[in-house]
Amino acid sequence: MELLPLWLCLGFHFLTVGWRNRSGTATAASQGVCKLVGGAADCRGQSLASVPSSLPPHARMLTLDANPLKTLWNHSLQPYPLLESLSLHSCHLERISRGAFQEQGHLRSLVLGDNCLSENYEETAAALHALPGLRRLDLSGNALTEDMAALMLQNLSSLRSVSLAGNTIMRLDDSVFEGLERLRELDLQRNYIFEIEGGAFDGLAELRHLNLAFNNLPCIVDFGLTRLRVLNVSYNVLEWFLATGGEAAFELETLDLSHNQLLFFPLLPQYSKLRTLLLRDNNMGFYRDLYNTSSPREMVAQFLLVDGNVTNITTVSLWEEFSSSDLADLRFLDMSQNQFQYLPDGFLRKMPSLSHLNLHQNCLMTLHIREHEPPGALTELDLSHNQLSELHLAPGLASCLGSLRLFNLSSNQLLGVPPGLFANARNITTLDMSHNQISLCPLPAASDRVGPPSCVDFRNMASLRSLSLEGCGLGALPDCPFQGTSLTYLDLSSNWGVLNGSLAPLQDVAPMLQVLSLRNMGLHSSFMALDFSGFGNLRDLDLSGNCLTTFPRFGGSLALETLDLRRNSLTALPQKAVSEQLSRGLRTIYLSQNPYDCCGVDGWGALQHGQTVADWAMVTCNLSSKIIRVTELPGGVPRDCKWERLDLGLLYLVLILPSCLTLLVACTVIVLTFKKPLLQVIKSRCHWSSVY
């Protein structure tokens, strides 16, 4: 009897534990498809046909993306009245019942992208009207027209962000966004919009970001969204962009007009805060210097704007598009892939704050460097892929490129640069002059030479760390061509014979170089001075496309990480040299497109097992006049290689001895045939009687 209370307590404890375990197992079974973190439930991609009902009722974020729900019923979300964020992206939704959001008074973010809501858009619109506190709504990819979108957005005055991207909207008027006074972000990209009526966005007083990319807009005229900060109209068919005239102050900071068909530089607001202007891939050019126009009528264009019963005429100067634009705060200007043949006087002077200028792939022939042109704040200048044959530097101009850090002049027609141009560029770190037919100035360089520039001098550019001279047709390098620089990256590729069989011209920068490219330079193994032992910090070496027959020499403490030996004349690799580099940290080596002998690759096991050869599947070798992939070679030494590994002396003896014996027998027969007396003597002396 004394033990009865103890047994009762133990029994009650085990029953409680068992009940808890069973209930926990049931809960885990119902929640196993979802990940629960705090108040967030992630059920994406679980092939759910309905909203799970056993999740914690206090959940505030529910993600059901990529589940075949098809229909959101009135009761689907009732267990979760505290939801603040709901994502139903790619759920094949065709219908949302009218009362689906009736109990979701706390919902702030709703994602319905990539569904089929155009099927029952009226019922969906009625369901959305029950969300008075909704701030973010994503309706992208639902095949909605402008009328459907207008109905769904009706009475949702609390919205801050709306996405209608990827729908079938064609025209916009003031009825589509009526009542959205608090809207700040509007995404309309990837529609079919070809017309925007005047006043379509007038009711959006708080709008700050507008995305109209990937549509069919032919022009934007009388642009007057003064409070807009970011406008993206890229990938349309724009031929004109004209802002509203007058003295209205615009808050526009970023304007993207890239990938259009603009013919003229856009007419920007007279007062703005523009910081980023993207004009890439258009048909723009400046034309004043190309056409001798003396008549004022030939220098203007008039736009007739008809809005109902009101007709406005806008007169624009064709040749001075930028003169009235406010570019004082501009930081980033991308004018690449256009038709600019020159830059007008004073164009860059209007941008004193400009730090990045991209003029890649235009038709520039000359560039005049004057005071404040380019501006002193410029840090990156890209003039690559033009037709530049000469750079003009104003006399007596000092520190014109004092802030420049990156200067790209590749793929032009330059023969040299003005004396002193780089001497004033005290902060330049990256310089690309590849694919220009330049030559390097001898030592000492004439700093006071006159006439057109005929060479380039890189000496004493203390800040220079990266230099590319690929394909410049350079002759043999002069003495100390890079003296006084801090080069860590040097590309001399495709300059045949530039080293003249020696690495001595690189001795000034050899201890600092980390990346060296000597591709397609005609290097061959007979260069006795081709020794990289002095390049103590070298990590990446490209020797592809040369005529090397032996492995380069790497002495000292050189620890390469990447080595490229493709397209050479290597027949084998010395195992000692390769093993040394592997032990020092060689991570990647390229060996393909060399005439290797298959009988000399059996020692490459360390390379193969270490996965060091990046192009191992492409490495081939020669076996009995057949090209075979190394990966397809049989295990062990191939049969055709065994004869090659025999002692050559023994092989020659085996081949010569039968020939000698045959020759001796033939000589004996001939002598005995033509010497009959001798034969008789031999017979008489060797005769003996037969015994029967």
From Swiss-Prot:
The keyword Cell membrane applies. Keywords: Cell membrane, Disease variant, Disulfide bond, Endoplasmic reticulum, Epilepsy, Glycoprotein, Growth factor binding, Leucine-rich repeat, Membrane, Neurodegeneration, Repeat, Signal, Transmembrane, Transmembrane helix. Pfam families: LRR_1, LRR_6, LRR_8. Residues 29-56 form the LRRNT domain. The keyword Transmembrane helix applies. InterPro entries: Dev_Immune_Receptor, Leu-rich_rpt, Leu-rich_rpt_typical-subtyp, LRR_dom_sf. GO terms for biological process: immune response; inflammatory response; microglia development; sequestering of TGFbeta in extracellular matrix; transforming growth factor beta receptor signaling pathway. GO terms for molecular function: receptor ligand inhibitor activity; transforming growth factor beta binding. GO terms for cellular component: cell surface; endoplasmic reticulum; endoplasmic reticulum membrane; extracellular space; plasma membrane. Mainly expressed in cells of hematopoietic origin. Highly expressed in bone marrow, thymus, liver, lung, intestine and spleen. In the brain, highly expressed in microglia. Changing L10P: In SENEBAC; uncertain significance. SUPFAM superfamilies: L domain-like (SSF52058), RNI-like (SSF52047). It is a single-pass type I membrane protein. It comes from the Eukaryota. It is found in: Cell membrane; Endoplasmic reticulum membrane. Key regulator of transforming growth factor beta-1 (TGFB1) specifically required for microglia function in the nervous system. Required for activation of latent TGF-beta-1 in macrophages and microglia: associates specifically via disulfide bonds with the Latency-associated peptide (LAP), which is the regulatory chain of TGFB1, and regulates integrin-dependent activation of TGF-beta-1. It is linked to Seizures, early-onset, with neurodegeneration and brain calcification: An autosomal recessive neurodegenerative disorder clinically characterized by refractory seizures apparent in the first year of life, mild early developmental delay, and developmental regression after seizure onset. Other features include hypotonia, hyperreflexia, peripheral spasticity, poor eye contact, absent speech, poor head control, and inability to walk. Brain imaging shows reduced white matter volume with delayed myelination, and punctate calcifications. Belongs to the LRRC32/LRRC33 family. This is Transforming growth factor beta activator LRRC33. It comes from Homo sapiens (Human). The gene is NRROS.
